[in-house]
Amino acid sequence: DKFSGKDAIVDDFPLLEQTQIIVKVEVDADQAVMMNFIHNDSYGLKPKHLMVSELKWKYLIRSAMRGKNIMMTGPAGCGKTMAAKSVVAALERPDYYFNLGATQDPRATLIGNTHFNKEDGTYFSEALFVKAIQTPNAVILLDELSRAHPDAANILMTVLDEGQRYLRLDEADGSPTIKVAEGVTFIATANIG
């Protein structure tokens, strides 16, 4: 499990409430920054707020700002994805979202596909994930990690390992590798129970 040790683990988010609340989080005393975090539901419903303790929320934000990998675990429907999306939006950094639970072909989603047409012949088209890991200071949300195809774990192993941080485009010796850019943070969600 690459989301352990030095990385932040925040679990058991309570259910969401149907009211709008703005949470103010003081980042670091030396930065003297106050940040407002609010989640606006993409379905046009009444804004919702995550009922997370202020201490857990501060820890989560500070961990993300410091570039630590974060894994949020809890039962289905408790607000992990919404909390992760709120963190991503609040950081105001380039962001990418990948629903690994809905991915049937992890190689296509995380690496890319080989295509053929009469004009160009055979060519390789990189996946958006390749662009994401090459984007400095990006925040990459890996949703539903616990439901991911087993091949996704093999592909992500070197990407998430602090000592490696690269993506191999092919299994063959000498195949190209893509280094993860500086400052890239991964936030993952996984169901338990």
Annotate the PLM regions.
Residues K2-G193:
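AAA+ P-loop NTPase catalytic core and its hallmark functional loops
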